[in-house]
Amino acid sequence: MRARMVSAAFVMVAEAIVAGTPPMTELERQHLVAHMQMTASWLEDEVSGLSAAQASFRPSPASWTILEVLDHIVVVGPIYWKDLQSAKPVAEGRAGRMNDIDVLWYGIDRTFRETALRSEEPSRTLKDVQSGLMAYRTQHAKLLEYVRTTKDDLRSRLVERQNCDGYQWALLISTHEQRHILQIRELKAHPEYPKH
């Protein structure tokens, strides 16, 4: 009996390996929703109530202001959504070569700084933080609802842009926001950042 159970367990593991990454689990969905809610809350906390001087503080000519950081998040929202929606199902094997840990570290470690693609730079047309937050909330609600309710197997869909699966891309959207929240905190910690 024990030998049959071990054999059955071995067959199940082998089938999972052959089939590639298993579908997104409910626990993964919960983790993704929790991460998205966390970053949304942090972003709101960091930018709500800023004065115009604080939102437009630029410590150096090459730096973005807090308003530009928020603008960038708003600009990339529809682009990243489109990337997620156009993720292609893979016939077999693993979708992408990224791992979840790397995606999480992307949001935490700003040691390696990236330059935004030209199409993803701040539009510089965002007039104030409130209008930026309104646009962000709309985009975020759409993505969050999709993540909460989708029946799509995000683990078997490839987002070619990042060579990752759909779950990782949705998580990367949230960790991308987390990176920029850290950037906002760096701006606020600058010695010349306005007090009011």
Model-derived features with residue positions:
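Surface-exposed, polar/charged faces of alpha-helical domains
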Residues: A34, G49-A53, W64, S86, ...
